[in-house]
From Swiss-Prot:
Family, per entry: Belongs to the DNase II family.
Known partners and oligomeric status: Plancitoxin is a heterodimer of alpha and beta subunits; disulfide-linked by a single disulfide bond.
Compartments, record wording: Secreted
Alphabetized Pfam families for the sequence: DNase_II
Species: Acanthaster planci
Any one GO molecular-function label of the UniProt entry: toxin activity
EC primary class: hydrolase
Domain of life, per lineage: Eukaryota
GO cellular-component term (any): extracellular region
UniProt-recorded name of the protein: Plancitoxin-1
UniProt keyword annotation of Lipoprotein present: no
Signal peptide region: 1-26
Amino acid sequence: MPSSVIMFTFLALTVLTAVMVGTSEAVSCMDNKNKPVDWFIVYKLPQDSASSKPVIREGYGQMYMDVNNQALKFSSTSLKDDDHAIAYTVDDIYKNHGKGNLAHVMYNDQPPAGEEIQSGLVGHTKGVLAFDGTSGFWLVHSVPKFPLPASKSYNWPDNAKRNGQTLLCITFKYDQFEKIGQQLKYNYPGVYDSDLPSKLVGKTPSIVDLVKNVHVTSPPWNRQLNLQSKSGQTFVSFNKASKWGEDLYKNWLATHFKSGLYCETWQNGGRNLNSSCEAGLNVYNVKKVSLSGGSDFKGTKDHSKWAVTTKSGLKWTCIGGINRQTSQMYRGGGAVCLENANVHKAFYDSVAEYEPCT
C-alpha cells in the first residue's frame, strides 16, 4: 500500500476518533494561560472605590494561585473579561453546548435571573460540574447568579462586583464524578442548568439523581469522602444535609482535624454564630482580611467561605459554601479541603483580625 494512502487512512481515523470521543482535549480546569491545570484557587476581591488598581475599583479584581504557581498573587486581568482561568474553564461548556459530547451540571441557591431551581429548601451551595468520558472539573464557589446557562456565554454578574468571593476548581478523572455526585446529594443542590448525554452518564447515576431532585432522605445526615484529583492530590469533601442541624466548622471540621480554625464566612445576616472556644478547639470568625498585593477589607465585604487550621504543623485549608449562622445549620452544604502548606500560608497569613471568644 502506498505511503500516501497509509497516511490518509491514519489521518481519517484520527479525525473520526476525535469526533466519536467528543471534545478534542480532555475537559479540565484551565489556568490563566488557557492551559490544563490540576487545580486553581481564585479569591475575588471586594470592590473598593479608593483602590489604586482599576480592576479593584470596578469590582472585578482577583487573586490567583494554582498547583504550578503556589502563591496567591494579584492578577491585573478583569473578571469581566474572558481571558482568565475561570472564563477559560467554563468556556468548554459554552462551546460544546448542544453537541452531546460534554456533560454538565450547574447549581446555585441563587441562580441567574430567569433560571429556576427545584422547589423546597435547597442547600446553600454553589458549583459547576463538567466532564467527558475521560476527565472533567468541579468548580466550587460562592458567587450568586453565576455562571450563566450553557446556551449563553461567560459573564461575571454585576451583583457579584461588591463583595469578596472564593472559587476552587479541581480537575478529576471520569471515575471520580460518581463519588462527587454521591456527596452532593447531601447538599441538595439547586440545579438550574444541565446536559447529561446518555453515553457519558451510564457510570454516574448519582449525577443523574442530582438533576432529578433526588437527595439524601435518611441518616446519616453527613458524610466525608476522599477524592483524588487527576494528578493525585487528595481533596476531602465534607457534605451535610439540612437535617444534620449543626455548624459545619465547629461541630465537624474542627473536631475532624482536632484543631482550631479561622473561618471567613458571610455574617451580614441575622443570628450569626459567635466565635467558639470549647474543648481547646477555638473556632474564630475572621473580621478583617489582608491579602498581600491585593487589598485589605472587612469581613462584612466578603461573601467567600473558607477556613484554615490553626494547630501547629497542620496545613489544611477548606473552601465551600456554608456560613457560620444559625440558619445555615439547617441548610445542606459543605466544603472541600486540601492539605497544602502554600495554600494554607496564603489564607492563614491573610487573617488580619478575628473575633475573640466572649
